[in-house]
Amino acid sequence: MELLVQQLVNGLAVGSIYALIALGYTMVYGTIKLINFAHGDVYMMGAFIGYFAVMVLKMNVFVALLVAMVVCAVLGIVIERVAYKPLRKSTRVAALITAIGVSYLLENAMSYFFGAESRPFPSDFGTETFTLFGDVSVNGKQILIFGVTVALMALLQFIVRYTKMGKAMRAVAVDEQAAQLMGIDVDGVISFTFALGSALAGIAGVLVGVYYNTISTTMGITVGLKAFVAAVLGGIGSIPGAMVGGYLIGLLETMVSFFGYSPYRDGVVYFLLFIILIVLPAGLFGKNVREKV
């Protein structure tokens, strides 16, 4: 029983990472109905920015988190302005293909400059372990992940619900043209949404580096897809849904490994996506919306 509880703790730590990345997917889709498949590579960029901050600039983990957050936010704005804004009036297929192209560009550019091999993430943070009860324990890295994730989720909910920019984001999500007629800077809102989602992905990248002590230029592919599954599971476009979906995927992966089927954990996640699209296409918190074509 205690071993099972320990796996649940581990699953919540992994799920926190998926939740942070899934929030970026769901915010962008909720605002402009775009699946930003380059988002996983922004997460990878965040990990390498954190690596540079810790290894070269000799910063501590907390400062590295802030640096990754700011740089990835700027990167998100650049990607939106250069790659997506010119295609805003184009078909969704064109935007989707562009997103895949941006993903390949970031991944291959990083592989060219830094190589495709894994790099050890230098962090001595969180080596201490705290016993909860019996043989169930939590380490400093997991506490960092839980603390940062909960704080960011609370901050995000506050921004979306109670700030002027958050209200503008919700208005653009409902009707972009009506929001523009009401005087809302739609371009600014969309850029802010990309910046916010990219900042969360950058922080997730640093947290993964701290947790697993290794990063690579291809790390964004699988994790990005799983975070997308989490967003779909929770109901893409729903912020609470992305949070719940991330934790559910993390727990599912951990339980699959716990029962001895670790080689199949990725397949189980993708099979879950298949089932969701058939049984519950709107996700757990999504709404079925009819569109006229």
Predicted feature residues:
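Helix-loop-helix "hairpin" substructures at the membrane interface of multi-pass membrane proteins
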Residues: 14, 136-215, 239, 244-245
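Transmembrane alpha-helical segments in multi-pass inner-membrane proteins
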Residues: 18, 58-70, 191-201, 205-271
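Hydrophobic core segments of alpha-helical transmembrane domains in multi-pass membrane transport
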Residues: 47-52, 68-75, 102-108, 146-157, ...
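Cytosolic-side transmembrane-helix boundaries in multi-pass membrane proteins
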Residues: 82, 113, 174-188, 260-293
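Transmembrane helix-bundle core of multi-pass membrane transporters
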Residues: 87, 92-162, 189, 255, ...
